Amino acid sequence: MTSSYMRLKAAAIAFGVIVATAAVPSPASGREHDGGYAALIRRASYGVPHITADDFGSLGFGVGYVQAEDNICVIAESVVTANGERSRWFGATGPDDADVRTTSSTQAIDDRVAERLLEGPRDGVRAPCDDVRDQMRGFVAGYNHFLRRTGVHRLTDPACRGKAWVRPLSEIDLWRTSWDSMVRAGSGALLDGIVAATPPTAAGPASAPEAPDAAAIAAALDGTSAGIGSNAYGLGAQATVNGSGMVLANPHFPWQGAERFYRMHLKVPGRYDVEGAALIGDPIIEIGHNRTVAWSHTVSTARRFVWHRLSLVPGDPTSYYVDGRPERMRARTVTVQTGSGPVSRTFHDTRYGPVAVVPGTFDWTPATAYAITDVNAGNNRAFDGWLRMGQAKDVRALKAVLDRHQFLPWVNVIAADARGEALYGDHSVVPRVTGALAAACIPAPFQPLYASSGQAVLDGSRSDCALGADPDAAVPGILGPASLPVRFRDDYVTNSNDSHWLASPAAPLEGFPRILGNERTPRSLRTRLGLDQIQQRLAGTDGLPGKGFTTARLWQVMFGNRMHGAELVRDDLVALCRRQPTATASNGAIVDLTAACTALSRFDERADLDSRGAHLFTEFLAGGIRFADTFEVTDPVRTPAPFWNTTDPRVRTALADACNGSPASPSTRSVGDIHTDSRGERRIPIHGGRGEAGTFNVITNPLVPGVGYPQVVHGTSFVMAVELGPHGPSGRQILTYAQSTNPNSPWYADQTVLYSRKGWDTIKYTEAQIAADPNLRVYRVAQRGR
């Protein structure tokens, strides 16, 4: 060996990184000191790390190290937010709502929320377990090890190089970011309303509306799931060519920030061996597979919080009655540091939770206020649950994990196993609003709101209207497993963010509490397309060879980019604009529809890179498809059918508006010309389309008039098509925005380019599959002491 190589190896050992050039060492080989951390990292193509360790602490160490290598700026920024320091470093105003987020995070710190989560619940399932605690500590140590040996000023990512807000992590930092994720769809979506809640003044409203407008409330609460969605298939033996279980995972998540996924394969020999993806900053696989079972998640329609209407004490708007006795709210003033000085806000808490407002609907008046109970606020079970899911051998064992831990904060589960059995379940954390409680405790003016939306407003003046406890629930206040919708099938289950009702069209799930979602109602265009794709594939009528699914056929279906809205109404729309070639836009302009009509007549009803006219149809649909036909509960996949009320003037107005907003001539621009994503100076063509248009492969990239759609905001992110065959799992994966946010990383844009051409990375799970990777790089990270 050359002396230069020996010097390089010595330097690597000094930094705690050993590069293996030949035989792969065991994770603990050459461990510097008993009780330290050591992990073996094998980087495969596209930077995907396969991490092996002897225990969960060292596994977390490896995860923290590689995630810091690839995304240290994202993790550091999320920690700043969770610690109530966002306003200080990023300003008090702007698109991040830094002031609101900082104030809320500071309140959570003052309340010792994360510390109390680590103490575990007073009653219910004990969590987090020792393995998870070890893994979190290890993650922190691995992140800090990378930062210490690299140095803030030598980071290669310009987004945080040399920034004062990049610092070593503590264990509590990581638990705070986890808590932020738990409450995302509950109190996290109501931050504005919680921060804005102040006692009434003489100038405020005297009373709240007696009959709240359900549509107005829905609009005000629209942020509860903004920016996230998903599709998933669980295919059983009757749906696959080989009779094995198969899963398609297709979460739709933001392309920037802490909610990006990160691909990895984690292994503690004999205890845990799971490949898939997790959100950046999380130490455990959240969507993925082991040798015999695979799973994905889709965003559930169930509600995560309930309102309590408070009857206030006359003359004292910060006191309320419970069973005829007054109780005082607890006022807490929180002061945060911003770039321009300190800012103070006062929060008001009740026995139910914080007071919140939705102006014009849920106002704080001299007589009435509203408090919320977020049932995820005490959810410390998530990482325990995902860890145990990864150890399940089949979908029945997986369901047992879900039943015991009830940890999923706001998602369904769709799974399949090597025996060919598929599972759907909404095992998410849901407030315990049973039919009996709703009937007895939702005041009459709020009953229509609950029936239409599942938003429950309970009578806060009665203690018997509290959420109570189910005997089989993991913790009090949530629906137990016996009240949740579950379906096992040997053909298929699916979900695309509608409710549980049609997870299996052959066996609809009905009779569940309204708070979980609606039943026997029209499904979204994306749900209908997802079901139609499966049914056509099983019948062999989709234009692809044969019948049934292989992973190759599943990939083709996933990226077929059908636009179901266009399939249903394009011909009628073309006929209409040919009969009436001019229309008045909503701004009063008279628009010639001739060119648009020609483009739509040639549109292939897909969102492929070479599809022309897709953007025009997408903008038209922003005005809403209007069916004259009715929904048939016995035919939910195909109704409402495409029968238009062509006399409705809004149809032609919507088309005129689409023409006005079109980035250029609809007859000359393809999806690949105008749907792009930036990677430095490079603009990568992006296929896919809006979910509202009935596109399965969702890509949301806002229109910039005169330019096109230059930046993806959210959509298809991690995609997995995996088959659980007799020789182990096989299939395809991709992470659309790539592993790293660092523009100087080799893994900054490689998978985005791969996605653009509908390519894939082959799943590598077995030792033989990993060893065969042509780009494999092996190294070990270690640290003395813990």
UniProtKB/Swiss-Prot annotation:
InterPro entries: Ntn_hydrolases_N (IPR029055), Penicillin_amidase_A-knob (IPR043147), Penicillin_amidase_dom1 (IPR023343), Penicillin_amidase_N_B-knob (IPR043146), S45 (IPR002692). Heterodimer of a small subunit and a large subunit processed from the same precursor. This is Aculeacin-A acylase. SUPFAM superfamilies: N-terminal nucleophile aminohydrolases (Ntn hydrolases). It is found in: Secreted. Its EC number is 3.5.1.-. Residues 23-34, 215-229 form a propeptide. Its main location: secreted. Gene3D superfamilies: 1.10.1400.10, 2.30.120.10, Glutamine Phosphoribosylpyrophosphate, subunit 1, domain 1 (3.60.20.10), Penicillin Amidohydrolase, domain 1 (1.10.439.10). Residues 1-22 form the signal peptide. The active site is at 230 (nucleophile). The gene is aac. It holds the Pfam family Penicil_amidase. Residues 35-130 are annotated as: Substrate-binding. Belongs to the peptidase S45 family. GO terms for cellular component: extracellular region.
